[in-house]
Design a protein with these regions (language model features):
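Donor nucleotide-activated moiety binding/catalytic core segment of transferases
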Residues: 201, 283-324, 329-330
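Hydrophobic beta-strand scaffold residues
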Residues: 142-144, 258, 282, 340
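C-terminal alpha-helical cap of glycosyltransferases
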Residues: 398-411
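Structural alpha-helical scaffold elements that stabilize or flank donor/cofactor-binding regions
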Residues: 113-115, 168, 292, 310, ...
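Catalytic binding pocket for nucleotide-activated donors in carbohydrate/polymer assembly enzymes
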Residues: 172, 188-189, 307-393
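Short, aromatic/basic amphipathic alpha-helical patches
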Residues: 89-94, 188, 270-279, 354
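Inter-lobe coupling/hinge segments of SF2-like helicase ATPases
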Residues: 202-206, 224, 233-287, 295, ...
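Active-site and donor-binding regions of nucleotide-sugar-utilizing enzymes
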Residues: 14-211, 215-217, 224, 234, ...
């Protein structure tokens, strides 16, 4: 059944590529993957293979990639993606020697791909469970590790009808899981080789903090050198339901500067944001100058790649997505020692639950709750600072997963 599904997906991507640009990139990338390997793989080199579904999973695996590259330079790095949103952004990443799409998990694709590269070990990030690739690796005696994986009782592996697909888990040499619950769930189905290491994203956000960029236009906007400057609210990866809440509040409160980095930066969405803002001077980042940004009340970030550095300038952060499919990266904000607000769809995000538990994160359901929180942060600086310190301490306390993984791997 699994292989039938894989062939159906492959057929669907092929047909869809005729009409959809994203699927077209995926289809072409998958078709070219083995050719790229045959051209670029060095016959006598030893390759460590990392597979990430998309950009978020890549960021989880990145600390591990870079630590191996630093400590074990004798190995080459192969990095694969399933999604164009990962590959297209990171296809020129300098931390890997070869970067390709991963062809759909059919028996033939897996055999061809692994004949072309023959890695000495493989790391699959978080939710990547590709049976045919893993089965070929296992058959060859190649260690395969699941990194930053997290399991819940409602997943198919732990249902009475999921035992067949659960075979894929037995192909891994070891699991590096995020929490004890995941380890216990694996134990219940007879998998004992699991180590609780935490989430490598904590290491990654600390790396990002260390490498953060100074942004002169943002510093001008917040009037960074003024002793009486306004507080700064940063909304990261926001969607319209998020924006409708916080903009309603800020339309009535003039004592904050507001930076909005929406998840979607298309013109239609930017126009919607502008329509929600009342009686404030607004500047887009791509149109900002040292002159006009100083007088602005709202700075809209209409380009990618700046958000993790922009959080540095905030006093309170809001991370979007919690009124939709799920919140975005709260750790990028929390690492900067400020309170982090987010919507209610956060239950499957361990880092959000941890921030809520430790007092550095706050759940927002509506404008009334948002207003109560923001009013207190505005009026009680000691409280706001203390909550921010708790957020930062939470991130620091859970760093170190990368070293724990490497201490359990033979390189």
């Amino acid at each position: 059944m699994y292989n039938i599904i894989m062939y159906a997906i492959q057929f669907g991507i092929a047909v869809g590529s005729l009409f959809n640009e994203k699927l077209r990139k995926m289809w072409r990338g998958e078709q070219e993957a083995v050719r790229i390997l045959r051209e670029k793989v060095e016959p006598n080199a030893q390759y460590v293979w990392f597979h990430a579904a998309s950009l978020g999973e890549f960021e989880q695996g990145r600390p591990l990639i870079e630590q191996i590259r630093k400590d074990y330079p004798q190995y080459k790095i192969l990095l694969t993606f399933f999604s164009p949103s990962g590959y297209e952004v990171r296809k020129n990443y300098e931390g890997a020697d070869i970067i390709t799409y991963l062809p759909i998990d059919t028996v033939g694709n897996a055999r061809r791909f692994l004949r072309a590269v023959r890695p000495v070990m493989a790391f699959f990030i978080k939710y990547e469970f590709w049976y045919n690739y893993l089965h070929v690796l296992q058959h060859r005696g190649t260690p395969a590790y699941s990194v930053s994986s997290i399991f819940r009782p409602d997943q198919i592996f732990f249902k009475w009808y999921g035992s067949g697909y659960g075979r894929v888990l037995r192909c891994f040499s070891r699991f590096f899981v995020q929490n004890e619950e995941s380890k216990e769930l694996l134990s219940k189905i007879g998998i004992s080789d699991a180590v609780v290491v935490g989430d490598t994203r904590f290491d990654r956000v600390l790396q990002i903090k260390e490498a953060s960029k100074k942004l002169p236009l943002v510093e001008k906007f917040i009037n960074i050198d003024a002793t009486d400057r306004k507080k700064v609210f940063v909304a990261g990866s926001s969607w319209q339901p998020d924006e409708e809440i916080f903009l309603k509040y800020f339309n009535e409160h003039k004592d904050w500067k507001l930076i909005i980095a929406p998840h979607v930066i298309g013109e239609d969405h930017l126009k919607t944001i502008l329509s929600l803002i009342k009686d404030k001077k607004v500047v887009r980042y791509t149109q900002a100058t040292e002159e006009n940004v100083v007088e602005a009340d709202v700075l809209i970030i209409d380009c990618f790649g700046l958000l993790s550095s922009i959080y540095h300038y905030g006093d309170v952060a809001y991370v979007g997505g919690g009124f939709g499919v799920g919140i975005h990266n709260v750790l990028e904000a929390a690492v900067w020692d400020m309170p982090v607000l987010f919507g209610p769809n956060n239950k499957h995000f361990a880092e959000a639950q941890g921030l809520l538990r430790d007092g550095g994160g706050f759940e927002v359901f509506d404008i009334e709750g948002f207003s109560l929180l923001m009013n207190r942060f505005a009026e009680d600086e000691e409280y706001r600072t203390a909550c921010g310190a708790l957020a930062g301490a939470y991130v620091e306390s859970l760093a170190g997963a990368t070293n724990k993984v490497l201490s359990n791997v033979k390189l």
